[in-house]
């Protein structure tokens, strides 16, 4: 049933960044790995950690680029090209400044909104913006000059709790996506607020 064949979780590599807001996409992949019992392993030809799982009879590939965020497109395009997965069958999980913690939404297409990971993915997919995005709200520092340090810092315990609740709902919705399709998953997730 799933129209999605590749799920990508964005983040920066290394322990220094593991708990920072910019790694919210990777946090969601980690939850999916626990839910669906798969392990990511490093595949250097894809510049990332990858896994393959069959869920509800659907083959799904998972990717966490091991490059820094602004080079995420290299991994996405390498894996998508190798397995002939078109952009319309890719779901990218990423942090979203424009949503408060506790909100997550799915959408298809659009620009990068200043997100350097999305910017590079769009560029590496030959400017094709038609991939899906699951945007995980992390809140905004209020001043655009503070954004760079904000995304590279840990959320407050209260914000982390709200983000975790949205990640739990997103995990449920990705399971729905695999069984019943992206429209049903989108409608449910986009109505959720922790």
UniProtKB/Swiss-Prot annotation:
GO BP terms in the entry: protein quality control for misfolded or incompletely synthesized proteins; rescue of stalled ribosome
Pfam families: Pept_tRNA_hydro
Enzyme class at the top of the EC tree: hydrolase
GO cellular component, one term: cytoplasm
CDD domains with a match to the protein in the record: PTH
Site keyed Discriminates between blocked and unblocked aminoacyl-tRNA: positions: 12
Origin superkingdom: Bacteria
GO molecular function: peptidyl-tRNA hydrolase activity; tRNA binding
EC number, as in UniProt: 3.1.1.29
InterPro entries attached to this UniProt entry: Pept_tRNA_hydro, Pept_tRNA_hydro_CS, Pept_tRNA_hydro_sf
Main location: cytoplasm
Positions annotated as active site in the UniProt record: 22 (proton acceptor)
Record field: catalytic activity: an N-acyl-L-alpha-aminoacyl-tRNA + H2O = an N-acyl-L-amino acid + a tRNA + H(+)
UniProt-listed HAMAP family: Pept_tRNA_hydro_bact
Subunit relationships: Monomer.
Recorded family membership: Belongs to the PTH family.
Protein name, per record: Peptidyl-tRNA hydrolase
Organism whose genome encodes this protein: Histophilus somni (strain 129Pt)
